[in-house]
Structure formats: C-alpha cells, structure tokens
From Swiss-Prot:
PROSITE patterns reported for this sequence: AA_TRANSFER_CLASS_5
Modified residues (N6-(pyridoxal phosphate)lysine): K196
UniProt binding sites for L-glutamate: R42
GO terms for MF: O-phospho-L-serine:2-oxoglutarate aminotransferase activity; pyridoxal phosphate binding
Annotated binding of pyridoxal 5'-phosphate, by residue: A76, T77, W102, T152, D172, Q195, N237, T238
Disulfide bonds: none
Entry's family note: Belongs to the class-V pyridoxal-phosphate-dependent aminotransferase family. SerC subfamily.
InterPro entries for this protein: Aminotrans_V_dom, Aminotrans_V_PyrdxlP_BS, Pser_aminoTfrase, PyrdxlP-dep_Trfase, PyrdxlP-dep_Trfase_major, PyrdxlP-dep_Trfase_small
Taxonomic lineage from the root: Bacteria, Pseudomonadati, Pseudomonadota, Gammaproteobacteria, Lysobacterales
The name this protein goes by in its record: Phosphoserine aminotransferase
Amino acid sequence: MTRAFNFSAGPATLPESVLRQAQAEMVEWNGVGASIVEISHRSADFMAVAAAAEADLRSLLSIPDDYAVMFTAGGATTIQALLPLNFAAPGQAADYVITGHWGKTAIKQASPYVDARIAADAETGGFIDIPPAASWTLSPHSAYVHITANETIHGVEFRDTPEVGTLPLFADFSSSIASEPLDISRYGLIYAGAQKNLGPVGISVVIVRRDLLERAGQPRADIFNYASHVARDSMLNTPPTWNWYLLGLTVKWMLEQGGVQEFARRNAEKAALVYGAIDGAGGFYRNLITPAVRSRMNIPFFLPDEQLDALFVSESKAAGLLALKGHKAVGGIRASLYNAMPLAGAQALANFMHDFQQRHG
C-alpha cells in the first residue's frame, strides 16, 4: 500500500512509523495479554505510559520545573472556556489579541466568564498581518493576555514572543507546538490540541506556571479546576488512554528525529518550497499574508478563480495530495506542513503546482 501525502489542517498526518507501531500493538500490548485501550488507566502499565509521555514532552520542549503539564480530554476550544474560570477573578478583565479565526473563537468562548477585551484586532486589515505589540491596548490589571501563536485558516504566525510586561501571556499553540524552539518561561500558560503536531484528536496539552494555579478563579466544578487535574496527574477522571498513548509515541518519535531544532530546520525547508512555488508563479498563485508573519505550518493560497481552485483540489487528490481544499471561511487552497509531513510531500506539492500552472495558467 502506498500512503498519500495528507495536507489536512487537523486531524493531521501522523508519522507512519508511529501508526505501524500502534497497529502492531493494538490487539496485544507490551506482553500484558490485552490491548492498551483495554487496560486500566490506573494500572502500573498505563501509569508508566503516562509518565513517559510527560517526561519526553518535557525533554522535547525544555519545559522548566516550575511549570506543570496536564493532558486533558477534548480540544483547545474547551480550554479557551476554562481559562477565565481558573485564572480570572469575578469581574476581572482579560486581554485578547485577535489575529484570525481561532483568536475570535478564543474570545467567544471566554466572554461568558470574563470581561474579555480586545487588545488588538487584525480583522480590519483582513488578517494579513499581526499588529505590533507596542500598539496593543492592555489593561494593567488584566488576568492575562491571550494570543493565538499560529492561525491555521488565515496563515499568520507569531515569529517572536510578544512583550506584555508583567501580565501573564497565555497562548494557543495547537498548530505550531514543537515546530521550533520555544522559551516557555516567557509564557504563563500555553496549550495545544494534539491533532496537528503531537498526536491524534481528542487529547490536549496544557503547560502552566505553577504559581498561577494558586489563583482562586471563579466558582466551578472540580472537574473544571486545573489545580485539581495537576494534583491528580491528569487522572481526575478517566482520561483518553489511547490518545495519550499515541501522543507519547509521537513525542518519542520527534525526540528520535532530533527534536525541535531539527524540525525547525525541516519546517523552514518545506515552507520555502511551497512559498517559492507561490511567489515564483507570476501571480497565478496568490498568498496575501505579510511575508514576515507567514505561517510555516499552514499556507493558504488562491488561484485566479474558484473554478480553478476546485480543479486544483480534484487533480491534486488524484495525484496523491490530499486535503488541500481551503477552509470554508476563506476558500482557496491550504497546505498544512506539520512536523510529520516529510520534505518529499512539500516537494511533490511544489512540483504539482508548477505542472498545474503549465497546463491551466
């Protein structure tokens, strides 16, 4: 069987070696006589899986000791609703920087629980750039400042950590975590749905500075209390064990491949191939994003008309290049180049783009 190149924005492509290992271990895992999905999450066997996943993630991301790591069920949207409940006092403000669709989602989810203020909004400019941090309107007593590190739909990315003074910086890293080195100590909290760079859909990672867990937050059930999750090693309730196991395999694979430094090199090379095909097409392909904030993970582009967009998607699929249709909010084409996408995939896409232009340009 030949696997196609999957450019899906999420759930996204996973390393083939990880999938093969999971396949081999699905029915009977590690000599225990049962599948990993059948054993208790509180068994010594699974506790070892969970501990290894955290240890490897700490190594991969160089997570400082004064930061706690949680593995939570669900995705980033759930986390966005829980942030103000855990870290904002009743009536307190929180600042949000809106640089795309997911920044808008973050403030929407938080708004019922906090005085959510827009510190900067790139929508008026069409989400093609990121307002400089010096221009943001921050509330001096804000609970936190929230950014979306990489916008998968519009294709803009913070290339540097913004300076927000003494306010805790919270960031959604769902689509760019582990794609390049990151100084986590510059953040109060980062979070990520796993389904782009860390593993399968259905589990997320929250990394939080421990002193922030001392905040009283707002009245909430214990299941929504992050301090309780940390105290119970992410097992306050039954976790998604299969997802956690696959996340652990994926993180271990990234370490074996050379870690975030190596993936930063690979990702820059892959992105350069696709952006090179766009910029060298004489306007046949268009990416509207300011070059300094172009995403390396998600590259949207447009052809001269919607009919050509549709033809591009159809022909690329036939050529073994999957999931290139752009998000319904913006249309066009989108190529997602997460860590598990090999260089050969980016090269195949660039070659196809050149061939398509020769035939239809």
